Amino acid sequence: LPRRRRRPARLILFLRFMENEYQIEQYVEGMSVLTDVYDKMCSYEDLEISYREARKGKRYRPEILKFSDKLETGLDLLLFELNEQVYEMGRYRMFYVHEPKLRLVMSIPFRDRIVQWSIYRYLFPFYDKQFIEDSYACRKDKGSHAAADKLQYWLRQAHRKELENPDKKCYYLKLDISKYFYRVNHEILLDILRVRIHDEKMMTLLERIINNPNQKFGLPAGFSPEDCPYEDWLDDTGMPIGNLTSQMFANIYLDQLDQFCKHTLGISHYIRYMDDVIILSESKEELHRWKDCIERFLNECLALSLNNKTAIRPITLGIDFVGYKIWATHRKLKKSTARKIIRKVKVICYQLSIGEMTKDEFKRRAASYHGILIHCNSHGLCTELNRIYCSYVKTLEQNGIGLSQVVVPEPKETKTEVQTVECHRNNRPPLRSCEDASRDHQQAGIVHSGDECGG
């Protein structure tokens, strides 16, 4: 007899509207669980693999060189602590980053990163199979560009329907969770993890990481990291930005929202990148109803709330998502992102012109911006970046002045936000042949635009 096809295993945390009240219920069907994963993780070979993963891209940092100098001793000590269940997290090093906005990043010692890589290597592949298809953050073969492509594919479908029937309009609901990483409830997160992880040793280790007694991660409502005194921080909420386990927990936590929207509300055009959610529909009323259901689900089940960026608009206005402004017909960088790229290109051009940056390093930096620009319609921005490059570097070389002999005053735009400059024909550099401009730009790693040479 043919084998009976097993129904897909899934765990759905959903709400049912009964007597004007929401009730949380767990629906378990053929659920797969993890057992004895802690003992498998606690081996010298596994820690050595995790060590190699943790040092990728930063192996020459002093902290990592110091640990690598006595690698066997360090891994043996770590293995002993894990086997005896006496492992404790080290102290966090805290600092602020300002891109894309002010964030408090918490960095852990390198030995703790090895442990987190061991946890990640066993837990994330298991949970990744349960996630919905249209969750794109911190997943293999996903990412921001894939998310932008999928959303634009949906917009093109909606645009074709509007062309066939002009009376049908399509709208989008943009959901943005307020201070997501600072508001994740520890008890709810641990309850979600316990459903699938049936290993007490692993749960004890995860609880030590989540409920770290030496560090607070949560912010009270209405506060930002920079204006909240440390004594007012909360110890029962929040996750440290910068931890590998934090991005994994963030996806697991909001997977409950994904399952609720897809299986309970029946939303087909739903896409999420970390805490940014976009939903498409032909009915404004339907979007408002979904928004109310989602907001109540977040408040009562996940102890989260939406911020004032949440909005319902026509898709013809474009959608801000993963750093781009996306339409059905084209895609542009957000204005704030374009201003930041212009500002950074001015800085690296200035550093190259005075000899503070090598050409190889300049090419690497320029290639990273090129990687962003090739995924959107950026003809005007490429022209402006090429103009900046010529004004800072090529002018000096054409005048026969060595880069190390000249000090160019640092532009004011490096300290303040600059406005996007339109490249008018009357302030372009002198026309050159297309071949000369293309060759110079390729050598420097800058995207060549035919406008600069008159082509």
Can you name each region flagged by the protein language model?
Residues 424-427, 440-441, 448:
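Intrinsic-disorder-associated, low-complexity terminal segments enriched in Asp/Asn/His/Tyr and depleted
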